[in-house]
Amino acid sequence: MWKIHNKLLIYILWIMEIRLVSSFTSVMLCGRIPGLTPGQRNMCREMPDALIALGEGHQLGAQECQHQFRGHRWNCSEVWQRNVFAHVIPTASREAAYTYAIASAGAAYAVTAACARGNISTCGCDVRHKATPTGGGTPDEPWKWGGCSADVDFGMRYARRFMDARELERDSRTLMNLHNNRAGRTLVKKMLRTDCKCHGVSGSCVMKTCWKSLPPFRLVGDRLMLKYQKAKTVQAVKGKRGLRLVLSRKKHAGTARAQKPVLDWPKRMELIYLEASPNYCERSLQTGSQGTSGRTCQRTGHGPQSCDLLCCGRGHNTQHIRRTTQCRCQFRWCCEVKCDECDESYEEFTCK
């Protein structure tokens, strides 16, 4: 289980105090959190309870990123140990694209969930899906809106304002981050589920009450991982409206239009990156890599966690481990469990 970094825990505890103190103290606390831009500090003062949800979203994103990359050379650990709300990774790589997208998705997800729980005073359930006197669906399957539908639009708006506020420069990296931020939070909205509950006598389903709910965040992480694998390289071009990112420059076939380039724009839901990924074999704070020395690997197999791939050709060490565990456990009436002690030995492989 991924553990919250000490700094993150301290920051969240600071923010939790805001609910119990005066507005003057809130201003002081928001001013003490490192990594915030002036715009983010203003948002903290205006709505401090939402910042608690953003801290939860940061944790969600960190846990999911580390789960998805747990067997890769780059395992998404170093970058989440820096300032909580500052830039999370400096290199404009494919991994940075995923990191920004999952962080933005986590922010939108957590704020939306906090609204549904009533933890943020300025939002609640989605009024567009509130209970209505008239039904819907078909005569065979009537239903109506009810319950508390997730107000994902509020979560997206707040996450956009807060996460995008740190992108102050108008350069290609900023455009990349903004694009991936949007892709992450938009995916949360697209993955909303419709849950229903049946009403009727003796288990019948005369009428269903339905509401919109958030999916498990693991599904969001899985979907973003697929987008990471299909992420597109972009380059910056300067046009009449300023700097923009394009996938590639293509030329029309035929002699008449052969010299006219065609700009291929990235799709809104695609993840994009500017730089090729480093190999992540060696420790580097600049790339967010801890290196692979000492990492546990699999001697057999050909996946990302295989010793051949993970150890970058340096080879691996083999350690013979022996331990005692409980085995052949039996329940005895009443009420205890008796177990034998068994010795087991196995080999563990770590990268040199």
Curated annotation (Swiss-Prot):
Q: In which tissues is it expressed?
A: Dynamic expression pattern during embryogenesis. Expression is predominantly segmented, with expression also seen in the limb primordia and presumptive gonads. In embryonic tracheal cells, expression is close to and dorsal to the tracheal placode.
Which positions form S-S bridges? Answer: 65-76, 115-123, 125-148, 196-210, 198-205, 281-312, 297-307, 311-351, 327-342, 329-339, 334-335
Cite the InterPro entries for this sequence: Wnt, Wnt_C, Wnt_CS
What are the GO cellular component annotations?
extracellular region; extracellular space
> According to the UniProt entry, where is the signal peptide?
1-23
Task: Answer yes or no on keyword Endoplasmic reticulum.
Answer: no
The biological process GO terms on file are:
axon extension; canonical Wnt signaling pathway; cell fate commitment; germ-line stem-cell niche homeostasis; muscle organ development; neuron differentiation; open tracheal system development; positive regulation of JNK cascade
Listed Pfam families:
wnt
Main localization category: secreted
Q: Where in or outside the cell is it found?
A: Secreted, Extracellular space, Extracellular matrix
User: What gene is this protein a product of?
Assistant: Wnt2
- Family of this protein: Belongs to the Wnt family.
Gene Ontology molecular functions: cytokine activity; frizzled binding; signaling receptor binding
Report the superkingdom from the record.
Eukaryota
**UniProt PTM:** Palmitoleoylated by porcupine. The lipid group functions as a sorting signal, targeting the ligand to polarized vesicles that transport Wnt2 to unique sites at the cell surface. Depalmitoleoylated by notum, leading to inhibit Wnt signaling pathway.
Q: What is this protein called?
A: Protein Wnt-2
O-palmitoleoyl serine-type lipidated residues:
202
| Function according to Swiss-Prot or TrEMBL | Binds as a ligand to a family of frizzled seven-transmembrane receptors and acts through a cascade of genes on the nucleus. Segment polarity protein. May function in gonadogenesis and limb development. Wg and Wnt2 have a role in the developing trachea and together are responsible for all dorsal trunk formation.
